Amino acid sequence: HVNGTLIHNNKIYESYHIRKEECEYFRIVVADINIKNLEFKDFYSSNECGPKYSAGRMQFFNHESQDGLLVSIGMGAYNKPSTFPQDKKTIISKIIFINLNTKKHIVYSLGHRNPQGLLVDGKNIISTEHGPHGGDEINKIIFQGNYGWPIASYGTAYDDVDKNEISSKGYLKSHSDSGFIEPVYAFVPSIGISQIIKIPNSFSKLWQNNYLLSSLNDQSLYRI
């Protein structure tokens, strides 16, 4: 299952996950762009057994003078509380940075649910993330930032979730009160948030430093 595609410096990167028995594994392959044939080679492989991977959006990024890829990795077991998002030892529910030379990764940010959109705009990193039953988020990503899932969310738990597994009152609404980073904006109800792109300033004098955000539920574009 292909998750994301990135073209950079005449190379094409594809992220995907494969299933073996009861596990799913996250992979990235890369190929030099050639109109006759694409010969993909392994770029990054995770040996972590995941419940179901999602997202997989990639962006080129320079972190501490090292070139690499930022990669958003979500999990598919959305309706059940999980320790993965707050566990720094796993890549699940994280945005990771993969060094282009060493192919080693670090956890760049944590506490994500399903970060479907990822954009690097200069020094700013912007992510869009599906919330539960509402609470879709636009986040400004900072290094080692914690975005709260599954403890804090402006969404509500699905009916098939035992709310007592989360807390007696469901998800915490305020992120900052618990030491997490607040979203730049949260959509309640959900819009089925997807990728975000920057509109070139040359497009319109009225739309300077604006972004376009796509919505799956509404089949609409939002200008921000």
Label each PLM-derived region with a short phrase.
Residues 55-74, 93:
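Aromatic- and glycine-enriched pocket-lining scaffold segments that form the walls
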Residues 2, 68, 75-224:
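Beta-propeller domain segments
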Residues 7, 60-63, 120, 198:
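Residue-level recognition of a conserved intra-blade site in WD40 beta-propeller repeats
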Residues 22-62:
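Asp-box/WD-like beta-propeller blade repeats and closely related beta-sheet repeat scaffolds
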